[in-house]
């Protein structure tokens, strides 16, 4: 569970690898991994005596990948890095490292998802309150429905009716 501001170990490792590759290849033209390995072997051979001539002959020829190595392709941050002749052990170690890394950071909109049901509930409550208010206010369709329904009759004991003057006739 990585914090929001930190990045996963895999991202850090890939960042360090890309920084190392940039520093190493900056002053030189692009060199393939096969050429770099051949140069290292030549430097090693120059320091030591060549006691085994077949090895010297193999170093001059094209290097063939051994049975325990294979090319490795890494896709990261929109870039592709291809490394030739990676030992199986190193590839397995990289896979374990990538698998043990934390999940990638979630986008910002994913954090807002738990808040959505609460926001919907509040919106629904406001809507229902407004609807209830509209129903109880004096609007014509609802008044007619309320007037049209007959009121239940009261008991037969009726209070005396007072004759009120018809003030409406004086209009």
Swiss-Prot record:
GO process annotations (BP): regulation of defense response; regulation of jasmonic acid mediated signaling pathway; response to wounding
GO CC term (a single one): nucleus
UniProt-listed InterPro entries: CCT_CS, TIFY/JAZ, Tify_dom
Assembly behavior: Interacts with BHLH148 and COI1A. Interacts with COI1A, COI1B and COI2 in a coronatine-dependent manner. Coronatine is an analog of jasmonoyl isoleucine (JA-Ile).
Protein family: Belongs to the TIFY/JAZ family.
Comment, domains: The jas domain (117-142) is required for interaction with COI1.
Protein name: Protein TIFY 11d
Source organism (scientific name): Oryza sativa subsp. japonica
